[in-house]
From Swiss-Prot:
Cell membrane listed as a keyword: no
Identification of the protein by name: Histidine biosynthesis bifunctional protein HisIE
Record organism: Buchnera aphidicola subsp. Schizaphis graminum (strain Sg)
Catalysed reactions, semicolon-separated: 1-(5-phospho-beta-D-ribosyl)-ATP + H2O = 1-(5-phospho-beta-D-ribosyl)-5'-AMP + diphosphate + H(+); 1-(5-phospho-beta-D-ribosyl)-5'-AMP + H2O = 1-(5-phospho-beta-D-ribosyl)-5-[(5-phospho-beta-D-ribosylamino)methylideneamino]imidazole-4-carboxamide
Main localisation: cytoplasm
Pathway noted in the entry: Amino-acid biosynthesis; L-histidine biosynthesis; L-histidine from 5-phospho-alpha-D-ribose 1-diphosphate: step 2/9; Amino-acid biosynthesis; L-histidine biosynthesis; L-histidine from 5-phospho-alpha-D-ribose 1-diphosphate: step 3/9
Region (Phosphoribosyl-AMP cyclohydrolase): 1-115
Family the entry assigns: In the N-terminal section; belongs to the PRA-CH family. In the C-terminal section; belongs to the PRA-PH family.
Gene Ontology MF, one: phosphoribosyl-ATP diphosphatase activity
NCBIfam families for this protein: histidine_hisI, PRK02759.1
Length: 207
């Protein structure tokens, strides 16, 4: 789970008065999710259990992010900065990180990956929507076979648009294809982050 273990052993707890700042970042989108503080006990608990635990300076106790809401932060990796007084924790967020029901506690300008993440959240939320008001909800209700069929149909339409050298139509059909693919992934309890992570693991020199 951890990288650069030798560097983590060098964390300067004395310099930081026993509290190390911890920056939390989404492993797939690189979105900065939140910031907190850890004492040595919180840090060791995070390492041992694999979920982010902070030290609350106001309540004077440890608290695991998401211990009440269920929106835990699953640890993927932990690295330290060059001064050994700050750590960066790469996580897989299991739900919304911010208490305002947002992906991030920071008000960041939307970029492409942030938009994709928001789109996924919307598509996932539609599982429980009234089918009268949502095309996505109706898709979910129609079942996996129908959703997979729609992905196939949109793939064919994307190919046909490319064969016609129609750029605008290709963009539109590609958008439909990606949308339906995301619905299919969520129907199978998967998400696009897993696709991104899988692509990261592939040897780019062979692409």
């Amino acid at each position: 789970m951890l990288s650069k273990k030798e560097n983590l052993l060098k964390l300067d707890w004395i310099k930081t008065n026993g509290l190390i700042p911890a920056i939390i970042q989404d492993f797939a989108s690189n979105l900065v999710l939140m910031h907190g503080y850890m004492n040595k006990e919180a840090f060791l608990k995070t390492q041992k259990e694999g979920f982010v635990t902070f030290y609350s300076r106001t309540k004077k106790r440890l608290w695991t992010k998401g211990e009440e809401s269920g929106n835990l932060l699953k640890v993927i990796d932990i690295v330290t900065d060059c001064d050994y007084d700050t750590i960066l924790i790469i996580v897989e967020p299991l739900g919304k990180t911010c208490h305002l029901n947002r992906k991030s506690c920071f008000f960041l300008k939307e970029n492409t990956l942030n938009f994709l993440s928001k789109l996924e959240d919307l598509i996932e939320d539609r599982k429980n929507f009234n089918t009268d008001n949502s095309y996505t909800a109706r898709l979910y209700k129609s079942g996996t076979k129908r959703i997979a069929q729609k992905v196939g149909e949109e793939a064919i339409e994307t190919i046909l648009a490319a064969m016609k050298n129609d750029g605008d139509e290709l963009i539109n059909e590609s958008s439909d294809l990606i949308y339906h693919l995301i619905v299919l992934l969520h129907d199978q309890n998967l998400n696009f982050n897993l696709i991104i992570e899988n692509l990261k693991k592939r040897k780019t020199e062979k692409l």
